[in-house]
A protein has these predicted regions:
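Lipolytic serine-hydrolase domain surface
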Residues: 4, 10-13, 33-49, 53-92, ...
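Serine-hydrolase catalytic-loop signature spanning alpha/beta hydrolases and amidase-signature enzymes
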Residues: 26-28
């Protein structure tokens, strides 16, 4: 990693907030660039955008290859995050990871906690959209991280890509497909202070229901106006009329209907 170049990029726009996006499985570099550029445009966020691109083969038949590549990438991602939080010109850092990208993202934060005895307060939010991550592994990662960034999950029980990942991995429950109300997940989420947005009742916009967080205008607006602005949904009343069964389980175990319109 060219650390001086990364630092120059942080300072290029004069903005003090950094958004690091980690793409998911079966995503070539050009596809990741397009997706992130579209997301930055649609959310209208006031961030320095940083795409962390790892070596996906870009094939649905290369799951094991991509998982190994994502694992290798966690050290480089840790260096990017460490560079960001150490820069005096950076005020806060948000990580947004999709699908398999959630694995190196949480691992990088875990490694920071191990090396430093904690995570910098500048790393304020980690948002995992449709995370392809074993739920028990995630529980262990959070235990090791301890007091750290706010974690937010976008989940959907009808995510067919994660259903296939569960089969490929031998039946391990994928974090992005949990029922946040069901035991033992709810207790874990409450105990760890994890916020969860359940998008199951929404149409997916794609045949696999794996990209709901970018396909729904309401969810994109929610990302831009609240999460990426550092304002958790639990801090504000939201209302758009028609509702679906989206929920928030926050640090005090509250459950709130979110303003995400049906499609």
């Amino acid at each position: 990693m060219d650390t001086p170049a990364v630092r120059r990029w942080f300072h290029r726009t004069g903005k003090r907030r950094v958004l690091v996006f980690v793409h998911g499985f079966d995503t070539r570099h050009d596809e990741a660039v397009f997706r992130f550029a579209q997301l930055v445009h649609d959310t209208g966020t006031d961030f320095v955008p940083v795409l962390f691109s790892w070596a996906s083969r870009g094939s649905v038949w290369a799951y094991d290859y991509d998982k190994e590549s994502a694992t290798v990438a966690r050290d480089a991602l840790e260096r990017v995050l460490r560079t960001a939080v150490a820069d005096p010109g950076v005020a806060d850092v948000t990580v947004l990871a999709h699908s398999m990208g959630g694995w190196p993202a949480v691992e990088a934060v875990r490694q920071m906690a191990i090396r430093d005895g904690g995570v910098s307060a500048k790393l304020g939010n980690v948002i995992l959209a449709s995370p392809d991550l074993d739920v028990d592994v995630f529980r262990g990662q959070l235990a090791r991280i301890g007091r750290g960034p706010r974690f937010t999950l976008f989940v959907s029980r009808d995510d067919h890509a994660l259903a296939l990942a569960k089969f490929v991995t031998g039946g391990g429950v994928r974090l992005g497909a949990i029922d946040p109300f069901a035991a033992p997940h709810r207790a874990m989420l409450e105990r760890q202070g994890v916020d969860v947005i359940d998008l199951t009742a929404m149409s997916g916009g794609d045949s696999l229901n794996h990209d709901k967080f970018t396909k729904s205008p309401d969810v994109v607006r929610l990302l831009g106006e609240r999460f990426l602005a550092g304002q958790p949904v639990s801090d504000a009343h939201v209302g758009l009329g028609d509702r679906v069964g989206a929920v928030l389980i926050g640090t005090v175990g509250s459950v709130t209907t979110l303003a995400v319109g049906a499609r």
